[in-house]
């Protein structure tokens, strides 16, 4: 019986979302989940049916090189920014929901930031903008 009660008390914490990063790009603020491990990057925003406004996911890649994204099992229309090691935007792309097309950065990148489609354009963010708030920077 005590084990059951312990599990019952722990159950709510198992479903809690991870801590969000507070990012800033120019004058725009954004909260982002942080995908660092291979498993987190692979899972990404798959199977999500909504993404709140001013929210996204920041992917950190192990290698600084050209990286690719795809939208398999991701029903949301997204935009992505590829960022260099300093957090500067080096490429912006739009991603089609559920597409298996592979989209790669034009330049080497350390990070990719996925947001709702059109968010970067709405905020006036373009190549060269710098993302602040990335851990370790």
Model regions and ranges:
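Compact, glycine-rich, soluble single-domain proteins
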Residues: 17-137
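Bacterial N-terminal signal peptides
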Residues: 2-13
């Amino acid at each position: 019986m005590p084990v059951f009660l312990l599990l019952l008390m722990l159950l709510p914490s198992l479903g809690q979302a991870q801590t969000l990063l507070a990012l800033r790009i120019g004058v725009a603020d954004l909260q982002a989940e942080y995908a660092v491990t291979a498993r987190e990057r692979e899972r990404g925003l798959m199977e999500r049916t909504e993404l709140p406004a001013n929210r996204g996911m920041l992917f950190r890649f192990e290698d600084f090189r050209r990286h690719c994204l795809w939208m398999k099992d991701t029903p949301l229309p997204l935009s992505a920014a590829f960022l260099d090691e300093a957090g500067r935007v080096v490429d912006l792309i739009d991603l089609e929901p559920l597409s298996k097309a592979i989209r790669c950065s034009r330049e080497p990148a350390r990070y990719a930031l996925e947001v709702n489609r059109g968010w970067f354009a709405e905020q006036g963010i373009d190549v060269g903008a710098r993302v602040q708030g990335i851990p370790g920077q």
